Amino acid sequence: MSVGYDRLKTSSLAELRAAIRSGAYRSHTAGLGQGYLQANLAILPEAYALDFMRYCQRNPKPCPLIGVSDTGNPMMFTLGRDIDIRTDVPAYNVYRDGRLDSVSADITEDWRDDLVVFALGCSFTFEHAVMRAGVALWHVDNDRTVPMFRSNIETVPAGPFSGKMVVSMRAVPEDRVAEVAEISRAYPLAHGAPVYWGDPAGLGIADIMSPDWGDPAPLGPGEVPMFWACGVTPQVAIEAARLPLCITHKPGHMLITDVAEDAEVPVVETAQDKR
Amino acid sequence: MSVGYDRLKTSSLAELRAAIRSGAYRSHTAGLGQGYLQANLAILPEAYALDFMRYCQRNPKPCPLIGVSDTGNPMMFTLGRDIDIRTDVPAYNVYRDGRLDSVSADITEDWRDDLVVFALGCSFTFEHAVMRAGVALWHVDNDRTVPMFRSNIETVPAGPFSGKMVVSMRAVPEDRVAEVAEISRAYPLAHGAPVYWGDPAGLGIADIMSPDWGDPAPLGPGEVPMFWACGVTPQVAIEAARLPLCITHKPGHMLITDVAEDAEVPVVETAQDKR
């Protein structure tokens, strides 16, 4: 039996996770589990894990690490009391040799004892804070995906992982730009402060209405385009590295954790019991 | 020729690093390289690096990771333009099989192609911010080492690394406690907000005047003991893991980086050129 988005919007975290785990809900997670941290996902063989972790440490704005599993253990015990990464994300992309091989609602069959799970913070957290401050975000109000661009900023490489930084764009009234930058800087686990604002040409972006990913968003009169480091950056780096196996969330279909959005550190109290 | 502390206090970063690299300066770094991030150090064989990095990610308050080297590469290119970790720390402790084997001003002879360097943020950064706000710190004013205690807080384990959290204590006037907590929370790369304040018994500390490390510090009238996660925590976890080889800085003798103390991310701009 499938469960609808509107009903889950008011569900408890436990009901929400049960609906996703059973496969009853397989759609996007924007607006669900409000108040809790959501995460991008990258699952890799252990042979690549140290280099990928170094890539995240060296590029903390596009790749804010919020959780790393033990090798071969699908339970993300630092992010929640009962999160099984094989079933608790609505939809997964499975890549083999750098190419998308399948899309699935359950990766139990793909799981291996040498896999390591990386959870990365996402932009929902700072967007909520910006909207609470009374700044409207066009893509949210119009139910579109935020526009994303390949920038001319080079990431700091680690092992096989490298590439240009992908950025997301949000248009903000000129007199709120400094305030929005300051608000987002307080969320280092959700990409932090913008990397740039103003003329898109400064990032090597020729046409602001032709994003490389997501939907185009208009610039209203008196609005300034602000650009944040984006979680698509590590996905592009992973694809370019052509790993034999890599599993990610399907874009927009995130892991919902037990960690409060305003937590200082992304570790639940029960994590200490898992010795 | 040795160089004195007082002269180096006003030296440029380049002069300071040259004096340390040549062995002319082998003493503590408190008050040197003002305005730049200083770091605790742990150098381990690659076989333990992924687990240690997971330990840091799971315990970000005692173990705030600010830099990780490539395996076998002694140049810390994300933390500075020209930092050679074999020579650029005033003094090192070399541990073999979990026991202190030697203290040295240069580890060029100990370097191996399988070593990975971890640099961790230290408390100097938030202490500077607290003092700028006009709150005096007794151990700084009296040229002592901050008192440190083994607490009853369990860290989140990863592989062979586990143990109790070590905390450092600073006495703060009751009416400044909330402000000091807020100031330090803004420095997640320097241990962040305190983990506790008030009656030391709550952390399992029997006698506040008998620290496990450092010097005792008095509690003045109207002062509250505040406790922060401490960088000795990973050193204790590493010692307990009895690694065949581990090299740390000698306590107080830190790595001085090129990263500004108030930088949003601990990565210098030239890091991108090191592909």
From Swiss-Prot, chains A, B:
UniProt entry keywords in alphabetical sequence: Lyase
Enzyme Commission code: 4.2.1.-
GO molecular function: D-glutamate cyclase activity
Transmembrane segment boundaries: none
SUPFAM superfamilies assigned to the protein according to its UniProt record, in alphabetical order: PSTPO5379-like
GO biological process: glutamate metabolic process
Gene3D superfamilies per UniProt: PSTPO5379-like, PSTPO5379-like domain
UniProt similarity note: Belongs to the D-glutamate cyclase family.
This protein's name: Putative hydro-lyase SPO1111
Lineage: Bacteria, Pseudomonadati, Pseudomonadota, Alphaproteobacteria, Rhodobacterales
